[in-house]
Amino acid sequence: MSSTPVVTPDITGTLPGAVVPLATAGSSDYTPTGVRFDVSIGGVPFMLTAGKDTPYVRQTAPIQKPQFDVSSQAGEQTLDQYWIRSQASWHRGAGVKFYEPGNSTNARLWEPGAELITEHRFESSCGVDVWTRDQATLLYRTALTGASAGLAYVTTGKLADGTDCVFTNEAGVINRRTAAGASTSYTGGTAPLTAIAVAGSKVLAGHAAGIDVGDANGSTMAALWTIASGATVVPYWVKGRIIASIGPSLYSLTLTPGGAIASTNIIHTHQDPSWVWSSVTDGPAAIYAAGYSGASSSIYKFTLQDATTGTLPTLGQAYEVAVMPTGEQVTALRSYLGGYLGLGTNMGVRVALMDTNGNINYGPLVVETAYPVYSVEGHGSFIYAAVQEGIDGLTGVVRVNLGQPLPHEDLRFAYATDAQTHDNGVPSSIAFFGTTDRVVLGVTGKGVYTQSATLLEATGYILSGRIRYKTVEKKAFRLADLRARVPAGTVALSALDENASEVNLITLGSNAADGTSIGLTQPAGNHEYLSFRTTLTCSGDGLTGPTLQSLQVKALPAPKRQRLIQYPLNCEDRETSATGVKFGFKGYAWQRIQAMELAEENNVVLQCQDFTNGETFSATIEQSEFARTAPRAADGSGNFAGTLKVTLRKLA
């Protein structure tokens, strides 16, 4: 162990470096020597000169910055110091984990750190219609109207004798179901049936022996085309003709009875004998057929070519216009609105664009699913997809809004869950009652579910994205404002913490609809983020429900508080300690000032020791200020002297 140098009280010259260390300020401790210093900052020692004009100060570091409101949502930065997050519309759909809205239309107002595509979005929903701007209401409920133990296939609805209806295959029996609830069963068909299709005034049904046909307004089926046993025929009606898939081959047929389907009717046979044609649809310039084999899947187009006047155009050869990522299989196709193509796959839903040449460009997965999507349909400005166990683990429908593309995201659109069966099972097909927007869903082994025209879902919810105000620092969530119209039923608000623990905050009813200034005493403590679930419940008769208008959450930042400590330090070339020991040399004060300024400029983490109270901690220099109070010595020996105020931010 090294010995401590002996220092006599009357030394007036330069002292050894061991007594007055001048190393660069850093993280090392200062080892006391013969001089009893008061403070060491980064290993550089000082004497305190605390007094009335130069006090020693300890204070809490500020945690909020001055700000003014330039947000796209008025009041998002407020004068009462609350951090606010507001949501008054949900029309951009589900799928966000964090709700950090920016400004999607004006880049000048884009909030740093915000995600433009989260504005007016939420994490998930169930049983709620979010597509009307500035409100959310309950959807109409569905009910099982045709129980079936076998395949339940629903084809696109139409008007039959002026009545909205759909055609269903319920365990091998063709039924025509009307929006009013009436049902007509067809006789004479060949079972077991596969898919059915509507061809103008005719209804087509495929089976293992060919294709049957019946009048849309009738009740009997008869053979249209036949095949030898050993295959299954699936018919599609596109561009005024029947396209039928049989194994790896596609056939072009007419509505005129033609007897046995022959090889002359083939328009394309895939070279892979295990190829499965999963869907056929038509676009403005071509017919599209999708299929798969193993991990490979593609979409082919057949362009229309001029034929003899008065006859249908002929079909050109098959061109592969889209190849899916390895492992993703196209299981459903539906063209819509002349330019869009809805793709159902074993991984979810995509949207593609068709050009005037019949080529397509598909986008990313809009909706991701755990099971294949076997049916896609269009209605209004929406594409509907049947999803298995996709609504809180149960089967139903997801709706994609083609009129609401997400900002800065090519071919990604707003989506949300829609009609639900409240049961599980494999959905085989989706349709609508004629010209209405009432969903009809076929579920294999369960039957046909139809959406009511008057009865609302008993309950539904919207789960917000996680609100964290664009920072992972802890927040103290203080207040919530819930606005809703509640003529009947209730609106309840609950909060979920980082562990998904949920606590109810308030329930609004028709007699107690004031949801302003809800105290957020739960979940207890400070949090990085909270999510909020708003649950809507309809009246007992199911005819009236509440309307959600807005939700606003207020919080304050709650990081670990830091301490600012201001030390008034004596800084002279030559000083005298409290015990009378003289120390220093010419340039000693200037070297210590430079050491502090260098540490401040480089934001060095310093080890600080206060020998007056025994405190040791890590810190950075927040501010330094030197005031010279002595003139230069007449003999030129220096006398650089004054008070150095150093403000430290305590880190630990």
Residue ranges and their predicted role:
Residues 2-185, 200-202, 206-218, 241, ...:
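N-terminal beta-propeller domains
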Residues 5-9, 15, 20-24, 28-29, ...:
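Non-cytosolic beta-sandwich-type ligand-binding/adhesion modules
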Residues 143-156, 195, 456-475, 554-558, ...:
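Extracellular ectodomain segments of secreted/surface proteins
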Residues 147-160, 189-201, 226-240, 269-284, ...:
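Repeated scaffold domains used in trafficking and secretory/extracellular systems
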Residues 184-188, 222-227, 261-269, 310-322, ...:
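Beta-propeller fold detector
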Residues 425-463:
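Blade-level signature of beta-propeller repeat domains, shared across WD40, Kelch, NHL, RCC1
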Residues 556-652:
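Extracellular/virion structural assembly segments
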